[in-house]
Amino acid sequence: MHCPFCSATDTKVIDSRLVADGHQVRRRRECAECHERFTTFEGAELVMPRVVKQDGSRQPFDEEKLRGGMLRAVEKRPVSMDQIEQALTKIKSTLRGTGEREIKSEMIGNLMMEQLVNLDKVAYIRFASVYRAFEDVSEFGDAIAKLQK
């Protein structure tokens, strides 16, 4: 690995640790030339399935779109970034675990709602109201009633 400080090619690993529930390796490295230390993260590159939209079009899975949807739902709610990242990791693991090359966007929305209902009920209602396109107050009431069961 090249040193980010002096671009030398000779670096050595000083320390390695598992992070992110064992899904990544954190390595502390030192440059043999300038002796600067830096941290790298290594993870498996796993291919996500393509997303089939409701109109039948297909597009690559977009993790940032997933993250953005969750961040909008939990905005100004007492949910930590760690909780959000864990929920996103669970969603991605479930999608990869299907073994399918393509998945429907509906499945992603349902997985998102499963995670949000466990994180924050208000965030769940926010997301569900947009995802399910609530038309009036009674639909909000129905969703809240389901949460209270």
Curated annotation (Swiss-Prot):
Belongs to the NrdR family. Binds 1 zinc ion. PROSITE patterns: ATP_CONE (PS51161). Negatively regulates transcription of bacterial ribonucleotide reductase nrd genes and operons by binding to NrdR-boxes. GO terms for biological process: negative regulation of DNA-templated transcription. Residues 49-139 form the ATP-cone domain. InterPro entries: ATP-cone_dom, NrdR-like_N, RNR_NrdR-like. Keywords: ATP-binding, DNA-binding, Metal-binding, Nucleotide-binding, Repressor, Transcription, Transcription regulation, Zinc, Zinc-finger. It comes from Shewanella woodyi (strain ATCC 51908 / MS32). Its cofactor is Zn(2+). A zinc finger (unnamed) spans 3-34. This is Transcriptional repressor NrdR. GO terms for molecular function: ATP binding; DNA binding; zinc ion binding.
